[in-house]
C-alpha cells in the first residue's frame, strides 16, 4: 500500500488551535471580525456520512478513518467544553452514569488503586484537579474541585497508553447519551458501558437484579434519522459473555442461582420520562415486545 501525505485543502479553524491562554483578550473582538482574518469552522464540511454508512457507492478515494480532521477537532473541543477535563486524559475504557453516588464510588475506588501502587498513575477530575498516590488530602481536593461548572463532568483513572478508565456523569436522558457519544466516538475507545438502573416490568423481578439486554425497543428516537427503528441493533456476543461472567464474579452465583439474579430480554428505551402517566398505551407495547 502506497501512502501519500499532502497539504490539506481544509484549513484548521483558529478555535481549534488556540488554547485558553493564547485566546486571552479575544473576548472583546467580534467573532465576525476574527473570521475575516482567521479560518473558522465551516459546518458544511463537518459530518458523519462515513461513520453513518451513507457513502455506500464505490469510489476511487477511500477514507482512511471514520472521522476526518475537521470532525475530530470539532468533537475534541466539545469534549473539553462538556466534561471540564483535557482531552488527553480520556482513557480507552469508558463508563457513563447519571447518579452522583456512582461518581463517589468511582473516586473512592480510584484513590484506592493509586495507593496500591498498581498500573494506575493519576486521577484527573473535572475542574482541573489531578491527584496521584503522593497527593495529600486528595479526597478533599476532589470534592472542592469546580466540577459543577460543567454539564457532563468527567473523571479519569489514568494508566499508561490510555489503558485506564474514564467515568462521565452524562445526566438524564437519551439525548445526553447521544451528545457525548457522538464526540467520544472520534477517540475510537475500546468500549463504553452505561452504569445505572432500569425499571423492571415483570413481577418475577426484584430490586437489585442484573439486566442484560439482548434486544432493544427503541422509543427514544434519538437515532431514528441514521438508524431507523425497524433496523435491529444486534447484541455483541463477546460483550454479552463478558458482562455475564462479570455478574457471576461479583455475585459468586452460577447456573440457576445466577439466572435468578441476571435477567436477559428486551429492554425499552424512551424519551418520555413520564411514560407511567400513559400506562395503558405503554403496557400494550411492552407486552407485545416481551420487554423486561
PLM features: what roles do these ranges have?
Residues 1-191, 199-292:
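Accessory terminal and edge-of-domain segments that mediate assembly/interaction
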Amino acid at each position: 500500500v502506497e501512502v501519500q501525505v499532502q497539504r490539506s485543502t481544509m484549513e484548521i479553524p483558529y478555535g481549534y488551535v488556540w488554547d485558553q491562554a493564547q485566546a486571552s483578550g479575544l473576548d472583546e473582538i467580534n467573532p465576525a471580525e476574527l473570521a475575516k482574518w482567521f479560518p473558522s469552522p465551516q459546518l458544511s464540511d463537518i459530518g458523519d456520512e462515513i461513520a453513518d454508512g451513507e457513502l455506500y457507492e464505490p469510489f476511487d478515494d477511500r477514507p482512511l478513518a471514520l472521522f476526518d480532521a475537521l470532525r475530530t477537532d470539532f468533537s475534541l473541543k466539545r469534549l473539553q467544553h462538556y466534561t471540564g477535563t483535557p482531552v488527553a486524559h480520556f482513557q480507552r475504557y469508558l463508563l457513563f452514569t447519571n447518579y452522583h453516588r456512582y461518581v463517589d464510588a468511582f473516586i473512592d475506588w480510584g484513590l484506592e488503586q493509586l495507593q496500591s501502587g498498581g498500573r494506575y498513575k493519576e486521577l484527573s477530575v473535572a475542574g482541573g484537579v489531578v491527584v496521584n498516590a503522593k497527593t495529600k488530602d486528595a479526597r478533599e481536593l476532589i470534592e472542592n474541585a469546580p466540577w459543577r461548572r460543567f454539564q457532563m463532568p468527567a473523571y479519569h483513572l489514568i494508566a499508561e497508553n490510555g489503558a485506564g478508565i474514564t467515568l462521565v456523569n452524562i445526566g438524564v436522558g437519551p439525548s445526553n447519551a447521544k451528545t457525548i457519544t457522538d464526540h467520544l466516538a472520534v477517540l475510537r475507545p475500546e468500549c463504553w458501558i452505561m452504569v445505572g438502573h432500569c425499571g423492571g416490568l415483570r413481577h418475577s423481578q426484584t430490586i437489585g437484579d442484573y439486566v442484560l439486554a439482548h434486544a432493544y425497543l427503541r422509543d427514544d428516537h434519538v437515532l431514528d434519522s441514521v438508524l431507523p427503528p425497524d433496523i435491529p441493533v444486534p447484541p455483541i456476543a463477546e460483550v454479552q459473555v463478558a458482562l455475564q461472567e462479570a455478574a457471576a464474579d461479583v455475585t459468586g452465583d452460577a447456573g440457576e442461582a445466577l439466572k435468578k439474579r441476571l435477567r436477559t430480554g428486551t429492554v425499552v428505551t424512551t424519551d418520555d420520562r413520564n411514560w407511567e402517566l400513559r400506562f395503558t398505551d405503554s403496557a400494550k407495547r411492552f407486552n407485545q415486545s416481551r420487554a423486561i
